[in-house]
Amino acid sequence: IFVNKMDRENADFYKVVEELQSKFGAKCLPVQLPIGAHNDFQGIIDLITMKSYTGFPPEEGEIPSSLQAQAESFREKLVEAVAEIDDSLVEKYLGGEELSLEELGDGLRRAVVAGRIVPVLAGSALQNIGISLLLDAICSYLPSPKERNIAVIGDSDNPETLEPSQDAPLAALVFKTSADPYVGKLTYFRVYQGAID
C-alpha cells in the first residue's frame, strides 16, 4: 500500500496506518516512515536499512534524532512479524540476535507472498519523493506472476485455473480504455496467459 500525497495539507501517515490496521488487521505494517508532512515533508525512513532518504534524487543519510525512537519502535514490530515466517528466524529473534538485512528482506518477501504482511510505504508522487524506493520495494518484496495463483475462470461448479505460459491460448483482461486526441483509442489489459503478436 502506497500512502501518496504526503506533501499535502491534512496528510497523516500514522492515521492511515491505524485505519488500515483497524479495517484489515495488524498485517498492514509500515516498512517506511515519512520525514515530516505537509509543507515540511522531506523524505522517507526505510525501516529495513534504517536509513533516511531525502529530496529528489534521494540522498541517503542517517535518521533524524527526533524520529529515531519512533523508527526503532516501528522496526521492532516489523522484525517481529517477519521473524514469525520462519522457525530459524524466530529462534534467532527470541535469542536476542539481530536479523541481517538479507534475512529481513528475504523474510519480508516470503511473508508478503504468503499474505501474512502487507507493506505500507509513503511518499509524494508529485515531488518524486519515495518513488524510487516504492519501485525498489515492488521488485524486492512483491510476488512475480509465476509466484501467484492465477485467476480462476468459469462458474463455481466448473472452475479453471490459468497458468502463465506463452504457448497457451490467450487469456487477458481489459481494465481500462481511453481515447487520446493524438494517439487514438488506447486499451490497457493484463495478460494472464498466451501472447499477443
Map each language-model feature to its residues.
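Structural and coupling elements of P-loop NTPases
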Residues: 1-197
